[in-house]
Amino acid sequence: MFSGISIWQLLILLAIVVLLFGTKKLRNIGGDLGGAVKGFKSAMKDGEDEQDHKRLADDDQPQNKQDAEQKAEQEKDKA
């Protein structure tokens, strides 16, 4: 992971961070970060869904007059 940094150095660094910020503050920061990531993923999914709906709506639209007439005839035949 980190070249040149041993596991002991990472543990000492973690201990210093915990002493400086405290576990409650770190927990709050972690929760806020997790909420931000969750919100970002949700927004990305909503954007993809919106694009899918727009793409499907565009596919339903006839491209020209002839296509519109053919679609109307097909709907009349079904009825």
Swiss-Prot record:
Ranges for region Disordered: 44-79
Domain of life: Bacteria
Keyword Cell membrane included in the entry's annotation: yes
Residue ranges, compositional bias (Basic and acidic residues): 44-58, 66-79
Coiled-coil ranges per UniProt: none
Record keywords, A-Z: Cell inner membrane, Cell membrane, Membrane, Protein transport, Translocation, Transmembrane, Transmembrane helix, Transport
UniProt topology in membrane: Single-pass membrane protein
Protein's cellular compartments: Cell inner membrane
Bilayer-spanning residue ranges: 1-21
Molecular-function GO terms, alphabetical: protein transmembrane transporter activity
Keyword Cell inner membrane: yes
GO biological process, one term: protein transport by the Tat complex
A GO CC annotation given for this chain: TAT protein transport complex
Main location: membrane
Summary of subunit composition and partner proteins: The Tat system comprises two distinct complexes: a TatABC complex, containing multiple copies of TatA, TatB and TatC subunits, and a separate TatA complex, containing only TatA subunits. Substrates initially bind to the TatABC complex, which probably triggers association of the separate TatA complex to form the active translocon.
Protein family (similarity comment): Belongs to the TatA/E family.
Function per UniProt: Part of the twin-arginine translocation (Tat) system that transports large folded proteins containing a characteristic twin-arginine motif in their signal peptide across membranes. TatA could form the protein-conducting channel of the Tat system.
Protein name in the entry: Sec-independent protein translocase protein TatA
UniProt source species: Alcanivorax borkumensis (strain ATCC 700651 / DSM 11573 / NCIMB 13689 / SK2)
